[in-house]
C-alpha cells in the first residue's frame, strides 16, 4: 500500500505574523486543514503519518527518526517549513534528512495543508515514472 508522510512545523511554533506565510492562518486553521489532508489521503487509499517538527536543531533528527520507522513512498513537506526566508536553514536540514533517510521516496511540497493530497499525487506520479 502507498504510504505518505506529511511533514510540517508544529502549528504552535509557527510565527503567523510572518508575511511570507498565507494571510489569516493560525494554529487552529492549520490543524483543521491537516485533518482534511489526512482524510483525503485515506480517501485516495493511501496510508499516512503526520510528523511535526520544531524550528530548531532537533528538526533533522526528528525527521530521520520518523523516516527510519517506516518506508514512505512520498514525503510532503509543508509550506510553513519552506516559505519563510528566515527558515531556509531549517528547510535545508529537512531536505537533507529526507534525502539521507528515505532516498527512494519522492519529495513533494504543498502550498497549504489542505492541498497536501494533491502534492502527494504529484510526487507519486514522479515516482511511478522513475521506478
Q: Model-derived features: where do they sit?
A:
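N-terminal, charge-rich interaction modules
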Residues: 1-20
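Short catalytic helix/loop segments, enriched in acidic residues and glycine
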Residues: 21-39
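Ser/Thr/Gly-rich flexible loops in soluble cytosolic domains mediating phosphotransfer, phosphorylation
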Residues: 31-34, 93-130
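A generic structural motif
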Residues: 42-48
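Short beta->alpha junction loops
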Residues: 49-58, 110-113
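Structural motif
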Residues: 57-64, 117-118
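Mid-chain, well-packed structural core segment of small domains
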Residues: 61-99
